[in-house]
UniProtKB/Swiss-Prot annotation:
Gene assigned in the entry: NS
Ranges where the record places region Disordered: 204-230
Keyword Phosphoprotein: no
Example GO BP: symbiont-mediated suppression of host type I interferon-mediated signaling pathway
GO molecular function terms listed in the Swiss-Prot or TrEMBL record: protein serine/threonine kinase inhibitor activity; RNA binding
Residue span of motif Nuclear export signal: 137-146
Protein name in the entry: Non-structural protein 1
Higher taxonomy: Viruses, Riboviria, Orthornavirae, Negarnaviricota, Polyploviricotina
Post-translational modification: Upon interferon induction, ISGylated via host HERC5; this results in the impairment of NS1 interaction with RNA targets due to its inability to form homodimers and to interact with host EIF2AK2/PKR.
InterPro entries: NS1, NS1A, NS1A_effect_dom-like_sf, uS15_NS1_RNA-bd_sf
Assembly and interaction partners: Homodimer. Interacts with host TRIM25 (via coiled coil); this interaction specifically inhibits TRIM25 multimerization and TRIM25-mediated RIGI CARD ubiquitination. Interacts with human EIF2AK2/PKR, CPSF4, IVNS1ABP and PABPN1.
Length: 230
């Protein structure tokens, strides 16, 4: 096993532990707590894949971080922080909407890249909106935290989430996954639309008027343009 892979996992485990202690003191905001839960699932998946114990990895990660901090001057730390662009975290869903459990009468699931798509194909003739929490950097979608499909009544009927065991996905991965989800839901005559915020950062405007590059019908309600793959 590559030593960099192991040490990276160890450092991630320790940094998660520090963030958890911070959250235990009720100091974290909603995006912070959301990332904490997502990263916990990711670490469990990576630990299982690598065959490493998380507690042991956390202790080793602490030693690595302490060694780095001993060698790091305050001035070097300031320069490092200043040179790293900070992503923005955009929330279209409340904490309750993100953490709510939901059931599927006719469950369908598909994995595309490192994203898992789930939907209830028992849903028919509904108006559905896709909302997501995600991070943005340089005006581009950086990472999807969670996307869910809601009916007008507020019921959850589908979602796209990163697989904990396969970290990392691209903007194209997200667009492809959204296309699959829309195709599956529209197969049962549901009308699906994507939130304006998600459209703006996933399908960035490319014309001189700043309009979304989606065709008019697709922009309005993301008409059925993709055959269902789920």
């Amino acid at each position: 096993m590559d030593s960099n892979t192991v040490s990276s996992f160890q450092v991630d485990c320790f940094l998660w532990h520090v963030r958890k202690r911070f959250a235990d003191q009720e100091l974290g905001d909603a995006p912070f707590l959301d990332r904490l839960r997502r990263d916990q699932k990711s670490l469990r998946g990576r630990g299982s894949t690598l065959g490493l114990d998380i507690r042991t990895a956390t202790r080793e990660g602490k030693h690595i971080v302490e060694r780095i901090l001993e060698e790091e001057s305050d001035e070097a730390l300031k320069m490092t922080i200043a040179s790293v662009p900070a992503p923005r975290y955009l929330t279209e869903m409340t904490l309750e909407e993100m953490s709510r459990d939901w059931l599927m009468l006719i469950p369908k699931q598909k994995v595309t890249g490192s994203l898992c798509i789930r939907m209830d194909q028992a849903i028919m003739d509904k108006d559905i909106i896709l909302k997501a929490n995600f991070s943005v950097i340089f005006n581009r979608l950086e990472a999807l935290i969670l996307l869910r499909a809601f009916t007008d009544e507020g019921a959850i009927v589908g979602e796209i989430s990163p697989l904990p065991s396969l970290p990392g996905h691209t903007e194209e991965d997200v667009k492809n996954a959204i296309g699959v989800l829309i195709g599956g839901l529209e197969w049962n005559d549901n009308t699906v639309r994507v939130s304006e915020t998600l459209q703006r950062f996933t399908w960035r405007s490319s014309d001189e008027n700043g309009r979304s590059p989606l065709p008019p019908k697709q922009k309005r309600k993301m008409e059925r343009t993709i055959e269902p793959e789920v």
